[in-house]
């Protein structure tokens, strides 16, 4: 029965094995798509490497960012992923839809790399200015929000679109960190404007933040990753954020359930099912309780734990960590798979995934701090 302490060194080995000449690969498996350096995966992996003072992951982050910078689009856009194929570099900015979140992940990664003393600021400033400018252009109407196409962020085969909580919060966080690191007050001011919109217009009656605002409607689904990123972007103890984090705990952890990526689950009798069923690249993964459709992702479980710690919710954090150990104890053959199904807690998706290995490392350190 594996514990966090037993899995932590194995997770580290996965993360070290994922390093390549062009950066940190998404997973240590012989599958072409997961051999790519994805911007979001590389940054998420690298951020924890910086926190742990791990030179291998820190260098992997730097190499990943260099690769992405070298293939930045003419308008400032950042690739979703870059991969080596038959000795040639293949660059993708998104296939089903453009991956807008890559731009903010890149800005955040560069800022953190410089903050931790792993690079001088000079090599990154021009590319970051271009990246931030393209987001300003995408804002288009001066609302401080960016309209995200369906599948335009990490949930790339899910029905999230519009003025998504996740992408606005990620942009705000990246601007805040970049503004502080590169001494750019205008970036910090912009971050504050975005956060003001989120805390004033996205809060629902139940205490959660809306997953997205769209013309004429509000997407009221619970977006765990969106709440986690918002928690990182806001000051510790921000009342609306604290309330939302507690509501998530009350609705899941206190009922003996780890929080899925999105709730509620979309079932075949739901009006949205046909759209979800047809929205995929390599086959439909979003069966009920699977993948984005109610799947439990270790990386977002870990970031939720970080959010609880950041905002002073220690009792909720300890309950989460205890539940995490119980769930892991039931998986003797755990191999850092992509997600757990929220109905049976079966493992699903790609094994030896850096997202998952990073989540385990974060949970391990939070438990032992």
Per-region residue spans from a language model:
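Composition- and surface-driven signal marking solvent-exposed, interaction-prone regions
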Residues: 61, 243-246, 314-323, 339
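Aromatic-rich carbohydrate-recognition surfaces in CAZymes
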Residues: 35-142, 168, 241, 298-305, ...
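Solvent-exposed loop and edge beta-strand segments that line ligand/cofactor-binding
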Residues: 25-44, 51-52, 56-58, 88-104, ...
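Short helix-adjacent coil turns
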Residues: 119, 183-186, 311-313
């Amino acid at each position: 029965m594996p514990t966090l302490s037993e899995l932590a060194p194995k997770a580290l080995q996965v993360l070290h094995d994922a390093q390549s000449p062009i950066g940190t690969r998404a997973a240590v498996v012989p599958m072409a798509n997961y051999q790519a350096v994805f911007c979001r995966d590389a940054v998420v992996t690298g951020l924890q490497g910086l926190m742990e003072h791990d030179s291998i992951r820190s260098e992997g982050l730097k190499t990943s960012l260099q690769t992405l910078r070298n293939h930045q689009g003419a308008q400032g856009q950042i690739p979703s992923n870059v991969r080596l194929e038959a000795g040639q570099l293949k660059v993708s900015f998104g296939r089903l839809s453009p991956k807008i979140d890559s731009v903010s992940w890149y800005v955040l990664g560069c800022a953190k790399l410089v903050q931790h003393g792993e690079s001088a600021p000079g090599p990154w400033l021009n590319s970051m200015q271009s990246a931030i400018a393209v987001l300003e252009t995408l804002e288009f109407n001066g609302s401080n929000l960016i309209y995200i196409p369906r599948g335009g962020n990490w949930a790339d085969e899910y029905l999230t679109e519009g003025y998504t909580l996740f992408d606005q919060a990620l942009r705000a966080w990246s601007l805040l960190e970049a503004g502080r690191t590169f001494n750019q007050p205008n970036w910090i001011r912009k971050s504050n404007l975005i956060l003001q919109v989120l805390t004033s217009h996205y809060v629902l009656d139940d205490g959660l933040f809306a997953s997205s605002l769209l013309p004429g409607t509000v997407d009221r689904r619970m977006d765990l990753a969106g709440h986690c990123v918002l928690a990182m972007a806001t000051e510790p103890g921000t009342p609306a954020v604290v309330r939302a984090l507690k509501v998530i705990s009350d609705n899941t952890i206190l009922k003996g359930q780890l929080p899925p990526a999105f709730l509620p689950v979309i079932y075949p009798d739901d009006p949205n099912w046909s759209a979800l069923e047809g929205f995929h690249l390599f086959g439909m993964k979003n069966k009920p309780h699977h993948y984005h459709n109610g799947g439990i992702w270790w990386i977002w479980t870990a970031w939720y734990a970080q959010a609880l710690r950041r905002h002073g919710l220690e009792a909720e954090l300890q309950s989460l960590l205890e539940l995490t150990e119980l769930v892991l104890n039931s998986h003797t053959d755990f191999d850092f798979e992509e997600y757990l199904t929220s109905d049976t807690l079966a493992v699903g998706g790609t094994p030896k995934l850096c997202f998952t290995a990073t989540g385990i490392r974060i949970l391990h350190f939070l438990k032992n701090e």
